[in-house]
Amino acid sequence: MAKKIIGYIKLQVPAGKANPSPPIGPALGQRGLNIMEFCKAFNAATQGLEPGMPIPVVITAYGDRTFTYITKTPPMTYFLKKAAGIGKGSTTPGKGSAGTVTMEQVRDIAEKKMPDLNSPTIEAAVQMVVGSARSMGLQVVE
Protein backbone atom coordinates (compact mmCIF):
# COMPACT_ATOMS: atom_id res chain seq x y z
CA MET A 1 0.00 0.00 0.00
CA ALA A 2 1.30 3.46 -0.90
CA LYS A 3 2.06 6.07 1.73
CA LYS A 4 -0.54 8.81 2.23
CA ILE A 5 0.63 12.18 0.92
CA ILE A 6 -0.26 15.01 3.30
CA GLY A 7 1.12 17.84 1.19
CA TYR A 8 3.67 19.39 -1.11
CA ILE A 9 6.06 22.15 -0.09
CA LYS A 10 7.65 24.31 -2.79
CA LEU A 11 10.73 26.31 -1.79
CA GLN A 12 13.69 28.05 -3.39
CA VAL A 13 16.79 27.26 -1.38
CA PRO A 14 20.36 28.47 -2.04
CA ALA A 15 22.58 25.54 -3.09
CA GLY A 16 24.52 24.10 -0.16
CA LYS A 17 23.03 26.61 2.30
CA ALA A 18 19.91 24.88 3.62
CA ASN A 19 19.51 25.53 7.36
CA PRO A 20 16.62 25.26 9.84
CA SER A 21 15.93 29.01 9.87
CA PRO A 22 12.98 30.52 7.93
CA PRO A 23 11.65 29.73 5.37
CA ILE A 24 12.73 26.07 5.58
CA GLY A 25 12.21 25.40 9.29
CA PRO A 26 8.62 26.67 9.63
CA ALA A 27 7.51 25.11 6.32
CA LEU A 28 8.77 21.64 7.27
CA GLY A 29 7.88 21.99 10.97
CA GLN A 30 4.20 22.62 10.19
CA ARG A 31 4.06 19.20 8.52
CA GLY A 32 6.01 17.53 11.34
CA LEU A 33 9.01 16.65 9.16
CA ASN A 34 12.61 16.28 10.35
CA ILE A 35 14.14 19.65 9.39
CA MET A 36 17.79 18.71 9.92
CA GLU A 37 17.42 15.51 7.88
CA PHE A 38 16.20 17.58 4.90
CA CYS A 39 18.93 20.21 5.35
CA LYS A 40 21.71 17.59 5.40
CA ALA A 41 20.29 15.67 2.41
CA PHE A 42 19.73 18.86 0.36
CA ASN A 43 23.19 20.27 1.12
CA ALA A 44 24.80 16.94 0.17
CA ALA A 45 22.81 16.80 -3.10
CA THR A 46 23.71 20.37 -4.10
CA GLN A 47 27.35 20.17 -3.02
CA GLY A 48 28.76 20.25 -6.57
CA LEU A 49 26.74 23.31 -7.62
CA GLU A 50 27.78 26.95 -7.37
CA PRO A 51 27.24 27.99 -3.70
CA GLY A 52 24.26 30.31 -3.25
CA MET A 53 22.62 29.40 -6.58
CA PRO A 54 18.83 29.38 -5.97
CA ILE A 55 17.51 25.83 -6.41
CA PRO A 56 13.75 25.23 -6.57
CA VAL A 57 12.81 22.14 -4.56
CA VAL A 58 9.47 20.32 -4.22
CA ILE A 59 9.15 18.36 -0.98
CA THR A 60 6.48 15.66 -0.75
CA ALA A 61 5.36 15.13 2.86
CA TYR A 62 3.89 11.76 3.84
CA GLY A 63 1.55 10.82 6.71
CA ASP A 64 4.24 8.83 8.54
CA ARG A 65 6.35 12.02 8.82
CA THR A 66 8.76 11.01 6.07
CA PHE A 67 9.46 13.00 2.93
CA THR A 68 10.97 12.88 -0.52
CA TYR A 69 12.20 15.85 -2.50
CA ILE A 70 12.91 16.76 -6.11
CA THR A 71 15.37 19.50 -7.06
CA LYS A 72 14.84 21.42 -10.27
CA THR A 73 17.08 23.66 -12.38
CA PRO A 74 17.65 27.24 -11.16
CA PRO A 75 15.16 29.92 -12.30
CA MET A 76 15.52 31.31 -15.82
CA THR A 77 15.94 34.83 -14.40
CA TYR A 78 19.04 33.67 -12.48
CA PHE A 79 20.69 32.45 -15.70
CA LEU A 80 19.65 35.59 -17.63
CA LYS A 81 20.99 37.98 -14.96
CA LYS A 82 24.24 36.01 -14.85
CA ALA A 83 24.59 36.04 -18.66
CA ALA A 84 23.90 39.80 -18.83
CA GLY A 85 26.16 40.51 -15.85
CA ILE A 86 23.50 42.48 -13.96
CA GLY A 87 22.17 42.38 -10.40
CA LYS A 88 18.50 42.82 -11.24
CA GLY A 89 16.23 43.38 -14.23
CA SER A 90 14.87 46.70 -15.48
CA THR A 91 12.25 48.48 -13.37
CA THR A 92 10.57 49.60 -16.61
CA PRO A 93 10.75 46.74 -19.14
CA GLY A 94 10.05 47.90 -22.68
CA LYS A 95 11.23 51.46 -21.95
CA GLY A 96 14.64 51.10 -20.34
CA SER A 97 17.20 48.42 -21.09
CA ALA A 98 18.90 46.63 -18.21
CA GLY A 99 21.47 44.92 -20.44
CA THR A 100 21.91 42.61 -23.40
CA VAL A 101 22.20 38.87 -23.98
CA THR A 102 23.22 37.12 -27.20
CA MET A 103 21.20 34.43 -28.98
CA GLU A 104 24.03 32.00 -28.20
CA GLN A 105 23.63 32.68 -24.46
CA VAL A 106 19.83 32.35 -24.81
CA ARG A 107 20.20 28.96 -26.53
CA ASP A 108 22.61 27.84 -23.78
CA ILE A 109 20.07 28.79 -21.10
CA ALA A 110 17.26 27.03 -23.00
CA GLU A 111 19.34 23.82 -23.13
CA LYS A 112 19.99 23.99 -19.37
CA LYS A 113 16.29 24.62 -18.60
CA MET A 114 14.93 22.05 -21.08
CA PRO A 115 14.16 19.33 -18.44
CA ASP A 116 11.90 21.73 -16.48
CA LEU A 117 10.18 23.41 -19.43
CA ASN A 118 7.06 21.97 -21.00
CA SER A 119 8.24 22.64 -24.54
CA PRO A 120 8.69 19.87 -27.11
CA THR A 121 11.57 21.46 -29.04
CA ILE A 122 14.65 23.53 -28.31
CA GLU A 123 13.29 26.30 -30.57
CA ALA A 124 10.18 26.63 -28.39
CA ALA A 125 12.38 26.72 -25.28
CA VAL A 126 14.51 29.47 -26.87
CA GLN A 127 11.35 31.52 -27.46
CA MET A 128 10.40 31.11 -23.77
CA VAL A 129 13.84 32.36 -22.71
CA VAL A 130 13.61 35.32 -25.13
CA GLY A 131 10.20 36.21 -23.65
CA SER A 132 11.58 36.09 -20.11
CA ALA A 133 14.55 38.23 -21.14
CA ARG A 134 12.27 40.87 -22.67
CA SER A 135 10.04 40.93 -19.59
CA MET A 136 13.17 41.64 -17.51
CA GLY A 137 14.12 44.53 -19.77
CA LEU A 138 17.01 42.71 -21.47
CA GLN A 139 17.71 43.13 -25.17
CA VAL A 140 18.37 39.96 -27.16
CA VAL A 141 20.98 40.53 -29.88
CA GLU A 142 22.25 38.17 -32.60
Swiss-Prot record:
Gene Ontology annotations for the cellular component aspect, listed alphabetically: cytosolic large ribosomal subunit
Highest taxon of source = Bacteria
Q: List the GO biological process terms.
A: translation
**Modification after translation, per record:** One or more lysine residues are methylated.
Whether RNA-binding counts among this entry's keywords is yes
Coiled-coil annotation: which residues?
Answer: none
Keywords for the protein's UniProt record, in alphabetical order: Methylation, Ribonucleoprotein, Ribosomal protein, RNA-binding, rRNA-binding
The record, for InterPro entries, names: Ribosomal_uL11 (IPR000911), Ribosomal_uL11_bac-typ (IPR006519), Ribosomal_uL11_C (IPR020783), Ribosomal_uL11_C_sf (IPR036769), Ribosomal_uL11_N (IPR020784), Ribosomal_uL11_N_sf (IPR036796)
GO function term, MF aspect, one: large ribosomal subunit rRNA binding
The UniProt entry, under NCBIfam families, shows:
L11_bact (TIGR01632)
Instruction: Describe its function.
Output: Forms part of the ribosomal stalk which helps the ribosome interact with GTP-bound translation factors.
The Swiss-Prot or TrEMBL record describes its family as follows: Belongs to the universal ribosomal protein uL11 family.
On assembly, the entry states:
Part of the ribosomal stalk of the 50S ribosomal subunit. Interacts with L10 and the large rRNA to form the base of the stalk. L10 forms an elongated spine to which L12 dimers bind in a sequential fashion forming a multimeric L10(L12)X complex.
Protein name (Swiss-Prot/TrEMBL) = Large ribosomal subunit protein uL11
Gene name, per UniProt, is rplK
